[in-house]
Amino acid sequence: MSDFGINLDAICDNVKKGQTESRTGSQLSNRSSRRMDFVDDEELSTYFNSKASVTQSDSCSNDLEIKHSIITEAVVCDESAHVSADAIQEKDETVPQMDHRIMKWMLDSHDGVSLNGGINFTKAKSKLKETENEITEMKSKTNLLVNASVGINSNVGAFNPINQTIKTEAVSDMFEDEDIEGCICKNCPYREKYRKLRSKMKNVLIDMINEM
């Protein structure tokens, strides 16, 4: 294993930071160019293994920011165990394990997940077909109510309604039996109000379609 190096100059600079606030660029460059002081890896391991962890009390400064910076530059701490000089190299990456509950969910799932790694889109296709049927039904109902021609103004780049024609014969579909003898709708006092309201709603619908 290669020697474990600690930048002692960086630690000293952090300690002196609270005492001297102003530094010139040449001083900083000189300190950053100093060589690393290497120590024996076995001695370093022995020292750190004799301590539960490296804490703030190991710093000689009362400045919390400097304490944390010294701890960060000195060693990576592990609160649950002793710190070794080669702890970083010995650390293995954690491999996520498949939980039995996840496997059971995949086996019992009815949402289209298959065991072969593929995806079954049967349920999704049926839902899509139902949605398409609903859209088609809505369009057919709209066509019964409105017949609007929408043009595009190439100069402005916006929709420009050219021709709008309302099928007025569809307005009285609720009163289609009003000519039959004994129909109560024939003499309804709200008949005209309903017609006006229905016509107004259709005009609003035409405006909405033209703006889309």
Swiss-Prot record:
GO terms for molecular function: ATP hydrolysis activity; magnesium ion binding; nucleotide binding; RNA binding. This is Non-structural protein 5. Plays an essential role in the viral genome replication. Participates, together with NSP2, in the formation of viral factories (viroplasms) which are large inclusions in the host cytoplasm where replication intermediates are assembled and viral RNA replication takes place. Orchestrates the recruitment of viroplasmic proteins such as capsid proteins to these factories. Mg(2+) binds at residue 86. One of its GO terms (cellular component) is host cell cytoplasm. Belongs to the rotavirus NSP5 family. Keywords: Glycoprotein, Host cytoplasm, Magnesium, Metal-binding, Nucleotide-binding, RNA-binding. GO terms for biological process: viral genome replication. It is found in: Host cytoplasm. Its cofactor is Mg(2+). Homodimer. Interacts with VP1. Interacts with VP2. Interacts with NSP2 and NSP6. InterPro entries: Rotavirus_A/C_NSP5. O-glycosylated. Pfam families: Rota_NS26 (PF01525).
